[in-house]
Amino acid sequence: AQVFAKILENRGVSVGRVSRGRAPDSAKELAMVESATVAEMVQRMLTESDTDVAESLGHLVGKELLNDSSFAGGARATSQVLSRAGIATQDLALFDASGLSPRNRVSPATIADVLIDVATERRWTELAQGLAVAGVTGTLANRFTTKATSPGRGVVRAKTGTLTGVAALAGIVVDADKRPLVFTVIGN
């Protein structure tokens, strides 16, 4: 409220004392804004590889689990969530939730373990649904479009990762027997 009042004052609007309170029952709603749900944000983050959303969600998880919404809190909370899910985290060093810190370290095996859990456990539905679909959505919309790669179109669900000198693709594909297969490829 203080920030909003300051913006108004900077634009020449006179603002009285700002305080907390409850609107009377007779008050009329002027406007309402609703954000996406956390599940929708997770799905967008994965499909579009949105690092800003990833970092914001990391801060949110850090605040919720550790009462620490810092970069470090988000990273620690993320590791804690994975640990609680039975994912080995000894090969994991996180310094942010976006994946942009050059100090972050994660092994292909750890990523594969997360994807195995995503493919087999109902608790990760939003993560599975958020993975981009090859040749169709998000960061994979323009991939798997050649004759040689088209069999993967609409079948491969994956997350891309790109930093200077590093490219990664990790995801899930369902085989002819309806078994989920996971893959992780990291090149640098």
Locate predicted features.
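C-terminal soluble interaction/assembly domains
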Residues: I87-N188
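A small/polar active-site loop signature that marks catalytic segments
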Residues: A1-E126
